[in-house]
Amino acid sequence: MKRYRLHIWPVWLLLGMMFLAACQSDALSGENSGGAQQTTVRSDSSYINLRIVNSNATMTRATEAATAAENAVYDGILCIFEGADESSATLKTATVIDQLINNPGNSASVEITQRLATGTHAYGTNLYVLALLNTTSTGFKVSGNDLLFDDSSQKNKTISQIQNLVIHSVGSTDKHIGLFMSNAPQSGYIMPEISSDCLYDTEALAATGNRLTINVERAAARVKVTNAANQIRNIRLNPRNGDSETRHPYVHKITWSLNHYNTQSYAIRTGFTAAENWATSVNYLISFTAKDFSLYPQKSLSQDVVYIGENTTGTETEVIVEVQLKDNSNMLMHECFVFHPYQDVYSENTYHDLFTSPEQYIAYLRDELPPENKGWFGLGGTDNAEIFKYATVKIDANGNVVFSLTNSDFTTVQQESLNNLANFLSNHTAGFRDGKMYYTYKIKHSDTQNGVVRNNAYNLTLVDNDVRQSMSAIGRPKP
């Protein structure tokens, strides 16, 4: 019986190469590039040697590589296609890789011998290999020698048909392990071909002979947010509370979510297979239409990593950071307000006064409202105490500030002026519900292009002295 040896290498180990050698010795060569070959395959053998290599090496454009646990392989399916060339080859058999179950490949190298399904023969045609790794919850499973997706047989399907299947989930995110992986498309092809040079009569010969390599990649990008922020320096807390020193709010904790991202993950990356546009160029060619999906939150407040399905290249994927403020050791859990009559409160690099209760804010306006603000509304000669005698301010269900000014002693004309002033104050006040502020950051996979790339890892560090990723400036009142 002839046997061949198969190695699956994660694509993050080979981003500098991004090519596939269908059959090779210890060093990778680029001589075989998939697609149609002239070799006639005699495949009476039914064993493979599968090697999975995990790497912690930093990837291209990734600020932090995924961990070994995130790259671990917990189960796998090996799919064999048969045909004259890759585009016309159809799926013949699928085999569960038994020894991967409950035996995750967390080490640098894992060698597994696996028997293929019987009847894997090709005389005058070619065989091609597709690996599906960490398939739990994706929709894939094996019944006999048949690959099922949503309980529907994929037998005799082409690689393009398999490629466009939208998987249910990229895998486990509660423990950050077991992310779905499959073939990483190379320049001009997706699946490596099994040539006769990779087939051996005995298992011993296969173990020391040529080997077949498949590059694989995760179906998700990894995003991590780290909080290194302390004070928010351009906010002064309750400047009229009698304190002689200027106080600034502190960052108590952050939570974060993703917005504007693609929720679909395909079995294999779709769109193009040119390696030069994937591994080395800053001008990726795939783009998706940005949609405003529901926020994709952290699994829990104790975790700091989320995963984005498929590519969002060219779209504005955002990290929305929610910051809970505190005053020294006291949490700011009530409605807070900032008055900005002359400028956009979010773009000025100057102090802004934040009032931590409606009462504090109304007291400030009663004592400090500039005369010109009153004059705009015909109230220049009216005492501030009368203007704000029955004032109320609140944040409505939509996060908007609503001011109300009334005085039963005022004439109808004066009351109309009060209403106009109240509308002005509503439109020039930022209201922060429960002492929370929001910061939005775009994710970029190059200096000029928004979006994320499948299989990459992104790390956003929030600090209080970095202009580009700063929490020293005031945040938005709502996401």
Regions found by a protein language model. Name each.
Residues 14-17:
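Alpha-helical transmembrane segments
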Residues 24-27:
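Bacterial signal peptide processing site
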Residues 59-144, 215, 222-457, 463-464, ...:
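Tryptophan-paired
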Residues 19-22:
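C-terminal motif of bacterial Sec signal peptides marking the signal peptidase cleavage site
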Residues 98-101, 138-210, 436, 441, ...:
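Structured interaction patches on ligand/partner-binding surfaces of diverse proteins
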Residues 29-60, 217-231:
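A short, Gly/Thr-enriched small/hydrophobic beta-strand-prone motif that recurs across taxa
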Residues 42-51, 467-478:
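Short, intrinsically disordered, charge-balanced linker/junction segments flanking boundaries
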Residues 2-12:
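Bacterial N-terminal signal peptides that target proteins for export
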